[in-house]
From Swiss-Prot:
GO terms of molecular function: electron transfer activity; heme binding; iron ion binding
PTM text: The N-terminus is blocked.
InterPro entries, per database record: PSII_cyt_b559_bsu, PSII_cyt_b559_CS, PSII_cyt_b559_N
Species the sequence originates in: Spinacia oleracea
Subunit structure: Heterodimer of an alpha subunit and a beta subunit. PSII is composed of 1 copy each of membrane proteins PsbA, PsbB, PsbC, PsbD, PsbE, PsbF, PsbH, PsbI, PsbJ, PsbK, PsbL, PsbM, PsbT, PsbX, PsbY, PsbZ, Psb30/Ycf12, at least 3 peripheral proteins of the oxygen-evolving complex and a large number of cofactors. It forms dimeric complexes.
Protein name: Cytochrome b559 subunit beta
SUPFAM superfamilies associated with the record: Cytochrome b559 subunits (SSF161045)
Binding annotation for heme: H18
Role of this protein: This b-type cytochrome is tightly associated with the reaction center of photosystem II (PSII). PSII is a light-driven water:plastoquinone oxidoreductase that uses light energy to abstract electrons from H(2)O, generating O(2) and a proton gradient subsequently used for ATP formation. It consists of a core antenna complex that captures photons, and an electron transfer chain that converts photonic excitation into a charge separation.
């Protein structure tokens, strides 16, 4: 049952990475867009 024990850890890690990466990329993208539009 090593797969059942490894799968939740991989899922939590995947959710944590995407949960931090997606808002960060969207935040940086919106800031760069605001800077570009102002100029």
């Amino acid at each position: 049952m090593t797969i059942d024990r490894t799968y939740p850890i991989f899922t939590v890690r995947w959710l944590a990475i995407h949960g931090l990466a997606v808002p960060t990329v969207f935040f940086l993208g919106s800031i760069s867009a605001m800077q570009f539009i102002q100029r």
